[in-house]
Amino acid sequence: MNDQIKIRKATKEDWEKIYQLYNSLSDEDLYLRFFHLYRITEEDAKKIASNEDHVTFLAEVDGKVVGEASLHKDGEFSLVVHRNYRTLGIGTLLVKTLIEEAKKSGLSTVKFYTLPENTPMIKIGRKLGFKMRFYEDEVYGEMRLTERELNVNLATFSAP
């Protein structure tokens, strides 16, 4: 399926596709994304697509936007994948793309906040090696990019 998934940077012209994606999400999905039920406006979609104070990437399957991920200047990111396209690795691909973008931008840390019941996001965080902290009403995931590279290098190093 990964061959059919296209990850690309959003452009201002993508706002309608982003708006359609968010309007196709269930109330539960919107609650998990925003921590409360919120339906985005056209203006919200235009802001997401603008890349003004963040960078947004889209996941497309057969030309249809099925996922969106935004990375902010402080390293915090958000992610949403339409329910019908979960378990295909789209969320993981989007987060990996954000990690690479963060490295290119010189960020030392990427992080996310989610609700304890957002198991898909928690699974992605664990799979990619985020340090996870669980609180009563939220989960915090953090990856120090320089630390991750060091750990990968040490893990691949073999003593003579």
UniProtKB/Swiss-Prot annotation:
Keyword Ribonucleoprotein applies: no
E.C. number: 2.3.1.-
Listed result of changing residue 72 to A: Modestly reduces acetylation activity. Modestly reduces acetylation activity, reduces affinity to albA1 11-mer peptide and has no effect on acetyl-CoA affinity. Reduces acetylation activity
UniProt note: pH dependence: Optimum pH is 7.0-9.0 at 75.0 degrees Celsius.
Single GO MF annotation: acyltransferase activity, transferring groups other than amino-acyl groups
Result of altering residue 76 to A: Reduces acetylation activity, affinity to albA1 11-mer peptide and has no effect on acetyl-CoA affinity. Reduces acetylation activity
Impact when changing residue 113 to F: No effect on acetylation activity
Thermal dependence of activity, per record: Optimal temperatures between 70 and 90 degrees Celsius.
Domain (N-acetyltransferase): residue spans on this chain: 5-148
Disulphide-bonded residues: none
Keyword Acyltransferase: yes
Alphabetized Gene3D superfamilies for the sequence: 3.40.630.30
Outcome when changing residue 38 to S: Reduces acetylation activity
Effect of residue 36 to A: No effect on acetylation activity
Enzyme class per UniProt: transferase
InterPro entries, per database record: Acyl_CoA_acyltransferase, GNAT_dom, MshD_Acetyltransferase
Annotated phenotype, changing residue 121 to H/Y: Reduces acetylation activity, affinity to albA1 11-mer peptide and has no effect on acetyl-CoA affinity
Result of altering residue 76 to Q: No effect on acetylation activity. Modestly reduces acetylation activity, reduces affinity to albA1 11-mer peptide and has no effect on acetyl-CoA affinity
Catalysis: reaction(s): L-lysyl-[protein] + acetyl-CoA = N(6)-acetyl-L-lysyl-[protein] + CoA + H(+)
Residues annotated for CoA binding in this entry: 79, 81, 87, 89, 91-92, 118, 123, 127
Source superkingdom: Archaea
Keywords: Acyltransferase, Transferase
PANTHER family registered for this protein in UniProt: L-AMINO ACID N-ACETYLTRANSFERASE, PUTATIVE-RELATED
Family, similarity comment: Belongs to the acetyltransferase family. GNAT subfamily.
Protein name: N-acetyltransferase Pat
Biological classification of the source: Archaea, Thermoproteota, Thermoprotei, Sulfolobales, Sulfolobaceae
